Structures are given as structure tokens and as C-alpha cells.
Amino acid sequence: MGRLSTFTATEPIIRARLKKARDKHYKSGVLGLRAKPTWDGEAFTYEGTPVTVVACPSVLALWEAIDQRNPEQWTVVLTGVEDDDLGDTVLAHLLDGRLITPDPWDALRGNFSATTIEPALYRTHNDRAIANGLLTALSPDAYTPAPGGVLTRDHAMATIARDVLRIVKDVDVEIDSLAVLEWSRSQDVTEGLITLSASGGPELTAAFQSWLSERSGRLRKPVRALLAAERITDLVPLGVVAGLFDDSDGKSLGVFLGSHGLSDLDVEDLHSWYQNTRGLVTNSLNAQQQQAVLTTAASIVNELAINDAAAASELLPQGLDARLVQLSDAITDGLPNPLPAELDAALLSDVALRDIETHWINLQQHFLADRDHSCRAFGGAVRLARWLASPVAPAQGLKVSTERYVRVDSWVDTALVTARRGADQPIPAAALRAIIDVVLARRGQHDLSFAAALADAPTPPVQTIENVMHDLVIPIAKTSPTLLVVVDGLSMAATNDLVRSTQLEGWTELSANHDARRASALAVLPTLTQRSRCSLLCGELREGGDGPERSGFLSLLHTAQLEATGGVPDPIFHKKALDAVPSGAKLASDVRNAIADVTRQPLVAVVLNYVDDTLHHVDPGGTDWNLETITYLGPLLHAAKNAGRTVVITSDHGHIIEYGTSAKVTRANTYGQRAHGDFANLDPDREVVVKGPRVLTETNSVVLAVDENIRYGARNAGYHGGATPAEAVVPVVVLVAGELPEGASRVVGAEPPWWYAEPVKARDEPTVSSVKRPRKPAQDTLFDDDSEAVAALTNRLADNVVATRVFAEQLALAGRIVLQQAQIKSLLQTLVDNSAHEVTLAQAAAALGVATASVNGALMQAKRVLDVEGYEALRVGSGIVRLDVAVLKEQFGVSE
């Protein structure tokens, strides 16, 4: 008997030998392999030819296999019989006339089309196990020719990474730290590792893990440790946590390292791990993936009870919460307590405001700030703080009071709506409540002043709603086809947000009064729909519903010689007509056709009820007022733009919002929720009597609520009818798309000066905050900044950026763009000069020297130059352009 071979044949080994046979032009035959005479596998095919494997423990078994073979197929015999025992007759039936002793390395050489093998691949303990593991783990179509005919360790292991673990898909994609980070988050990473272990065996698995750790560069230590601990799926969230530590916090560091088997990592390893992870999270993952990673990382922090260390994080929610608390403390400490008698004096000191601004900038630099609703609320609070830090001049008379509301106090109301959306945590919520209370105290005085002026002006010295058609709309329609949009209940505060939304769609706001300012009108009193809207559309003081509005509007058109011709439907559309939208469309056919017909219908009016409806059914304070929010408004403006129409947006009255603080006051003879005729019951501190021809009651007099907390009926989401400017002053917004008409002037700087932070160069050196800040990580990060750095920004930054080699390369890479270097420099300078490093689209357009309608395209060109390698230095969104100065410096290699 011959000696029994200890080699076990596998399908990959057999396939490799069949390949060699095919290379010698064999198409079928008997392949004899010296191996254990055992076979547990199934029959298979090789390149379309069936393969039968037969275990042959004896010469007799060999003869049986030879006799029963199909000459058109492959027969593979596995035997341990020695050649001398076989005889020449048996050997003559075998390929090459002999038994072949398979070598797995030889099989791999053939599969990879290699002539030699790098020693680093096979000079290991039990190298045959690694070779067999490779043959077993790799699929038949995984093999690619070894470069230069040398099968290297890198080539073999990269094939495993690609074929078994799917770390990369393309053979040309290098496996590096980023690839490993991305792979660690894939859904099938655990399954892939199990498959590798089961098919490739422990020797190949260990060899591959060692190789993958080396390919991970600066991440080799954590990758090796987590692969060994079967926790590679935690590589990214743990990498986020790794950024929390330095040598000064040995306790937290020890807890982290000890809990995850990372004891051989030092601070430099953690720093590298964090930097690589941060790059992946901020630049490669979408918002949902980012949230998943950061939520997991935050859970790890909570489990390890290292929240103090996490307070300095620029990525983790704990870091955001800490910055919110710092800003909250700065606001609370800066507010006057108790309130002074003179509320129009500066209520915050310069020092307090600087401290607030410093913490606000720090908060905005946190990665999660843009998507956190608490941060958005504090955006409103910081604006309110700036307003409180500014002394307010007294407003004498209705004209000045109205101007103050349009230019300043309506923006206060806009910021109040934002701040009142609140924060989740107790300390930030208390800070918001504190500043809101101070603002309401000052705003309440302004409301009383406005109401008193309203009562003193039966014939108002301001634009009134019944004259808007005569004075503004009809003159515009005589020079340009016009769409009049009456948004019932639209307040000035909501308009501030709405106009910004229109600018994002390429609209430019024109000054109706040619004074570069937003126009307004005074509603009819009491400020109710059937009085004020009817008066608006009829062009005279009148009370009524849709019918009188229609007839009055058509009469106006006839008198102005703007009536529709050609038998088309009346060019005024209320809710019923607007709602007749055919399936698949966005506008009713009659509405769409009327807007498109600029020849026969020069002036078209539509009435939208959405805002007024929210006062009864929804939450106006939680609504973002934009073209998508207000039903039909977006499609209407789109149709108007296509038709080349000028758009006038106005309202019949504004509104105030219910925040759970109002109380019902019993009065007789009420008009809606905020007006009554019960003159015997008058609270002079909270109500005002108004009289005159514009008061559309039987006696031409009425009592109007001034205090926002008074209502005369059931609780709603909001109210109107009273004498606050939020209810009585309505917007008159004129919009054009494209070139400005001859003689027209755009609205410039509708926002008050405090809406954006004061330019850095105009401010004094900031003082150090008394609020204790969390310890920052030892390493510098892209988000590191402090008050000293902010104050040090000078005119040199823009000059230095455009002078760099990187800037020149970016210009070249950007290809054909219209923007010139001087325009980009001007934009940079404008952004740097603002301590918050942000401006409106209108301000950006001015800096770039382009029309507002073209600014989005210009900004996209600027981003192609300023955003280096995917790092976003210039951010554009929600009508705001923001510069990340830290990223700009980092990517262009400048210091100031």
C-alpha cells in the first residue's frame, strides 16, 4: 500500500489544476491528484464542461473511475496510491501520465497569472493554510492578473478586501484609511467578516486583519484592536469620541481606552483617529448617516460617564448643549434685573453684548448648530439682544410710529417668533424666556405708543389700504403686466421671511415708494377681513365678502382701462376658483391661463386665505413663511415669472400669535376677537378708542385691544382686529424677476442694522467672558476660534487668500466662470467684515456687483473656487451666505 497523502483537495485547487490543463489545450480527460481520497463536494462545471470528482482509495477504485468516465467531460480522481503501485496502464489514462501533487501556492500563481510570489505573502507560520484559505475564500471570477507577474501580499489581500468584504468595488480604488472608515459603516461588514473566517480559516483571517490594519495608516492601531475585538463597526463613532481627550484628562482617557481594548493607543493616535473620522463625518456622510454616527457616539459618552470631556466636542450633541448653556448664561447675565423705568434706553451693555456675540459665534461653529432647532431659536434671541443693546428714539405721531414698525419693530417680531420656538434644555429655555420677557416689555410700550397715535389720526398721514390700488397697483399695471396677490392675514413679521424666500427664487424687491425701503399700508379699522380686504380690492372704504370684492375690483379695472378683454373669465380669483386644480397640475386652469395672458388681462388678482386660516387651525408661530408654505403662492409666482409679470404682494390685515398667555375679557358688542363697542367697559392701559371715517362700524368708533394678551372670544392660534401694528400695518411688496424696469429702484437693507452682527472693524477689543468655558481639545481643529481671533481679522485676509497658489489653482480648476478675482475678493471682504461672517443674498449681490436675481449662480461659482477638496468654506442656504473663516484659513494656508 502507498502512503496516504495528508493533502485535502478543494474545489478551488481542482479548478486551478483544470486551468493549467486547459492552458495545455486539454478539453477533457482524467486529472489525477495526490490527495486524501475523500470528497464532500458536489459535481460542478469548469468553463461549461461538467467535472466529476471521485475519491479513489485503491487501484481498483481508480480503474472503476476510469472505466465509468465520460470522455467528453472532466474526471478528477483523488488518491493516495503511490505511482509504483499504479502501473503504466493506469498512468497512461491520466493527464500528463502522472499523479499531480497539488500545491496551493502553485494554484494561486496560476489563478493570478503570476510567475512568482512575494515572500512576504508566504513566509508565515502555516503558509499553506493561508494559501488554501485564499483559494477557498475567493470566488472564481475574483482573480485579476498580478502586476508584473508577481503575486504580492498587497494584491492578494486587496482581492480578499474587494471580493469577500466589499471594502472597495473597483480594482483601481486604493484601500486606505478612508476606505476602511466607510466600510466599517456598511450594513454587511459583520457578515463579511464571518464569511471570511468561515471560508478562509483563522490563519488567513489573522493575516488579512494585520494587512488591513497596516493599510489604515494612522488608524492602524484602532483598526487592529477593533478587528480583534470584533467591534470594527464602532470605528467611526469611537473615532468621534477619540477627539475628546488630551493628556490633561487622564481619568476620562483611561475609562475610554480601557472600555474598548485600546490600551496601546496614545494621545497622538487618538488625535489621528479623530481627524480622519471627522473628515468622513463632515464631508462624506449625508445628514441621516451623520445623525446615526453622532447619536451612537453620544450614547458611548453617556455609557462611559465622560460627559465633562464631551462638553468641548465640536461634533457631539453634548458639545452643542454646553455651548448653548454658555450662550444662555451670557444672555441671562447681561439682561437688566430689575427692568429700568426707561425701556427705550440701551438695556444691555457693550460688554454684555460682546460676550453674547462671542458665544453665539462659538455656538454657530458647532457642526450640529445649523440643524438644531434650539440654535435657531437662539439666532432670534441674539438679534433681540442686539436690539436691546441699542437705544430707541421716541416715535411721535402715526407716520413715525408706522415707519418704526416697518423698519425695526416688525423685525423684532420676526426674531421673537424664532426665539419663542424654544429650547429643549432647562437653562437655554430659561434664557430664552428671560430675553423674551424684556423684549415684550419694550415692545408693549411701542404698541401703546402706536395705538395712541392711531387714535389721534382719524385721517392717517400714511398709505392706507383703500388707496393701495389707486396709488400703487394700478400705476404699476399700466406700465407692466401685474399679478396682485392678497395674502389674507399676512403680517409684516411673516413678510420679512417670505420676501427672503422669493429672493431665493430669483425675485428682486422693488421700492414701491422709490425710497429704497419696503412699503406698507394701514388696514381699515377694526382690522377684520370683510372691512379691510373689501376696501383694498374696491379702492374705497367698503364692507363685504367675495361678491362686493369682485364687483369693486372689476369696477376699478374698468375705470383704469385695465379690464380684461376677449370674453375671458374675470381676472380675480378667490378660494373656490383657486381650488379647482386639475389632477396633476399645480394651478387651476383659469388661473394659469389668466396669468399667462398678459395681452388681454394686464392685471390679475388672487386672494389666498392660508395665513388667516392658520390663525384658527394651525400654529402660525411654528410656521416658516415661504413660497412652499402658503398654498398656491409658489406656483403663482412661477407662472408670473414665466409670463413676465410684476408681482405685488399685500394683505388686508396682520395678526398676533397666541402663546398660551392670553385671557378672555368679557365685553359686549364684539367685532371678532380683538374689537368691541362696549364703551362703558374700557381698560385704558390695555385698550384704545378710535374714531373716524376709517372705522367701519355703525358709529364710526370702536374699542380696539392693544395688549396682546386680551381677547374677547375663544382661544385660537392667533388673532386680528386690534390696534397693535402687527395687526394694523400690512406689507406692500413689489417683486420683479430679471432686469429692473426703467426708473425702478430695489429695496436695499430692509433689515435693521442689528439684524446682522456689527462689522468687526467697527468694534472695540472684546473683553474676556466671565463664563467658564469647557476645556478645548489639545489639537487645533477646523472649528477652533475665540474672541481674540475674531477681533484680529483684518482687511488682509481677503488679500492673502486671493494671493495664494491654492486660489490660483482653484480658479483654474473651476474652469469657465464669469466671476472675476476682484468680485470674489469683494465678497470675502464683506463676509470677513461682519463678525458673524454672514450676509443676506442682497448684500452678497451688492458685494459681487450682480443683480439679486443672478446672485445664486454667482455664489455657486464662488463656491467652486473657495470650497477646496470638498471642505465647505462658503455656505449658502435659507437666504443667508456664510463664510467659515477657520476652514478658509486652513484650506488656503493663510493665518489672517
Where are these regions (language model features)?
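…; additionally, a secondary subgroup of soluble metalloenzymes is captured
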Residues: 1-482, 489-647, 651-812, 818-829
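Extended intrinsically disordered, low-complexity coil regions enriched in Ser, Thr, Gly, Ala
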Residues: 90-97, 853-856, 871-872
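Short acidic, hydrophobic short linear motifs in intrinsically disordered regions
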Residues: 835-847
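Accessory beta->alpha helical hairpin/"wing" motif in late/C-terminal subdomains of nucleic-acid enzymes
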Residues: 842, 873-886
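Short amphipathic alpha-helical interaction segments
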Residues: 850-862
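A short, conserved structural fragment
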Residues: 863-877
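Short, amphipathic alpha-helical interaction segments positioned at domain boundaries
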Residues: 886-896
